[in-house]
Amino acid sequence: MDKQHNINRRDFLKIVGISTLGATASLYGCSPKKDSEKEGNTTVPVGKMTYRNFPPYEDKVSLLGYGCMRRPTLPAPDGTGNVIDQEEVNRLVDYAIEHGVNYFDTAPVYVQGWSETSTGIALKRHPREKFFVATKMSNFSNSDYDFGVKMYHNSLKKLQVDYIDYYLLHMLGAPGKKGLEGRFLDNGLLDFLLKEREAGRIRHLGWSFHGIKEEFDKALALHDKYHWDFIQIQLNYSDWKHASGNNINADYLYSEIAKKDIPVVVMEPLLGGRLSNIPEHIFTRLKERNPEGSVASWAFRFAGSPEKVLTVLSGMTYMEHLQDNIRTYSPLVPLTQEEKDFLEETAQLMLRYPTVPCNDCKYCMPCPYGIDIPGILVHYNKCVNEGYMPKSRQDENYAKARRAFLAGYDRSVPKLRQASHCIGCGQCNPHCPQSIDIPKELHRIDRYVEQLKQETL
């Protein structure tokens, strides 16, 4: 590794848990993740990737896009936290490009602000024409014009590029001053970005969305005035007709965008991993239908089948996930109507399980009081899906389930970062794209933990 890479890697110190505790919950929760089991088809095709192109644009974009919200990490040399494993990031990016992936999506706020730098280091080692890079204006906390312009220029610097292929107004959907008007229209930032697009430093300008229908309709209606080049939405077979919280069903979002002939970038095809870490009988149902394919491949085939989808983002922290997704899209086998109906039935089955709609995005972090919010919610959801949520001491597997939940909780989340330490300040709530009442959920989980400890269920 050269000097530049060593310097950056040493600088990638982050607060303990921001990058790894969510992964720890998956590794040391109630039981190993089912979908990581060896699949029947282990061949990873080369030169078979499905690409999408939407004239008049010339871009030939891989259907599999690389989401850079999460990164592999290593313990920091000084023991104070964790560092991005830049060598592993480079290896994953090299492998992705070798197998046809050419779209890389990042943002200034990802990985505690280090994702753009890490992504830039990995991509700089490849010819510029080999990849498209997407990043965002994540001006959630400060909508000042100068702050936004500085964020944009910093993105160019960190990514080590002269232009950005796909630039997004990040996470539209909140009403009022935190919405489109307050963050981009009233302060002149959208005018600035339009000029950057005209100058060629932004090749395609669009926005990503989480939020209420009125804000979506408002932003989409501005297409005639501003000409959005693409729009990024949450789309998966669960949210297609059963979106939770304030989110809108993906079939509505997609159909409205398609009416205007705008390409769609898909995020959350796995709902933050919840569509691969599923209850045992649903896992069996999917595997019986297609023994050779992974459970995740069902979700990716669903997300990639709509014809207006440009690319489907996946945060592939591990090589096995990258390889599995490459297999799914090399080439894509679109879902039949019968298979779509099968997945709708599967989505309805999953609604019976009271999981918290957390996608492990970590926008709620860091908590000012050190609570590992995503680690807690990921562990809780995992135990719900795997049947380790006893409702009564009379349950047949009460002792086993109680032990699995409590032991897994302590392994996944350090005691000082558990839900019992939440004071309910609510600073996390405005940042959650799923509109979860986070303190309420943490207090509910803490009460349940205490009932398990005291055996008072």
PLM feature segments, named:
Residues 54, 66, 104, 119, ...:
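Conserved, mostly hydrophobic/aromatic
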Residues 27, 54, 227, 252-457:
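Structured C-terminal cap/extension of enzyme domains
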Residues 75, 142-265, 270, 278, ...:
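Glycine/proline-rich, positively charged
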Residues 66, 106, 135, 166-169, ...:
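Conserved beta-strand positions
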Residues 103-110, 203-208, 311-313, 432:
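Short catalytic-loop micro-motif centered on adjacent basic/acidic residues
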Residues 115-119, 213-217, 322:
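Short, well-ordered alpha-helical microsegments
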Residues 2-131, 192:
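N-terminal binding-site loop/beta-alpha segment at the start of enzyme catalytic domains
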